[in-house]
């Protein structure tokens, strides 16, 4: 069975897409963003293609593309569409698959369903991206508690940001969830720099090793 990883975060704008690009590039994986909110600037799928050095055939089209950069439920309402969360199913592919959510776990897709509800149905391992700055201990532990309460498997925590040794130590200690590594903020964000940073800060074998 091909490896599938769900990338979520403790908040929005913390680096999930950059981490997703790094992981997808390292595994030569497929990438899927089920719902994209906001189309005026580069989409997350376009960013991943650029940063991961992936072929466009490795990017699975979004199930919903919404115009307004807002929570998916609100974007859908503005666009006068309704997201059918029951129709969201993990794609079948012939290589590893990286799935990126939007914002945090409790971001609503509709007025009845949040991302964590869908993740609970999928039962695929989650990688939680977390900031290293002030406030992240509380946010990360709350997110892990929510995943645990729904029996969603968690592969580990991927920190994003400046090195904070105690923060990166105490969260795994209190939660029992392992630290996968830390992706530093890069002064020059390009495919080569991202590839090198991922190699230096993460063990590819944790994710099952690189694919041909």
Curated annotation (Swiss-Prot):
Its main location: cytoplasm. Keywords: ATP-binding, Biotin biosynthesis, Cytoplasm, Ligase, Magnesium, Metal-binding, Nucleotide-binding. Mg(2+) binds at residues 17, 100. It comes from the Bacteria. It is an enzyme of class 6 (ligase). The active site is at 33. It holds the Pfam family AAA_26. GO terms for cellular component: cytosol. Its cofactor is Mg(2+). It is found in: Cytoplasm. Substrate binds at residue 37. GO terms for biological process: biotin biosynthetic process. InterPro entries: DTB_synth_BioD, P-loop_NTPase. One of its GO terms (molecular function) is dethiobiotin synthase activity. It catalyses: (7R,8S)-7,8-diammoniononanoate + CO2 + ATP = (4R,5S)-dethiobiotin + ADP + phosphate + 3 H(+). Its EC number is 6.3.3.3. Pathway: Cofactor biosynthesis; biotin biosynthesis; biotin from 7,8-diaminononanoate: step 1/2. ATP binds at residues 13-18, 100-103, 184-186. The keyword Metal-binding applies. Homodimer. NCBIfam families: bioD. Belongs to the dethiobiotin synthetase family. Catalyzes a mechanistically unusual reaction, the ATP-dependent insertion of CO2 between the N7 and N8 nitrogen atoms of 7,8-diaminopelargonic acid (DAPA, also called 7,8-diammoniononanoate) to form a ureido ring. This is ATP-dependent dethiobiotin synthetase BioD.
């Amino acid at each position: 069975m091909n490896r599938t990883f769900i990338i979520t975060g403790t908040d929005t704008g913390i680096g999930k897409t950059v981490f997703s690009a790094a992981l997808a590039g390292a595994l030569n994986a497929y990438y899927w963003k089920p719902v994209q909110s906001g189309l005026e600037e580069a989409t997350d799928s376009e960013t991943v293609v650029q940063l991961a050095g992936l072929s466009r055939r490795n990017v699975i089209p979004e199930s919903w593309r919404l115009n307004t950069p807002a929570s998916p439920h609100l974007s859908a309402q503005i666009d006068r569409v309704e997201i059918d969360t029951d129709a969201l199913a993990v794609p079948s592919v012939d290589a590893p698959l990286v799935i990126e959510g939007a914002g945090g776990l409790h971001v609503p897709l509709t007025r009845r369903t949040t991302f964590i509800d869908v993740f609970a149905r999928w039962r695929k391992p989650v990688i939680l991206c977390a900031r290293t700055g002030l406030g992240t201990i509380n946010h990360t532990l709350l997110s892990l508690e929510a995943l645990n309460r729904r029996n969603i498997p968690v592969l580990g925590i991927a920190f994003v940001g400046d090195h904070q040794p105690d923060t990166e130590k105490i969260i795994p200690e209190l939660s029992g969830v392992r630290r996968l590594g830390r992706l530093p903020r890069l002064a020059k964000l390009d495919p080569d720099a991202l590839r090198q940073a991922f190699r230096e800060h993460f063990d590819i074998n944790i994710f099952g090793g690189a694919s041909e």
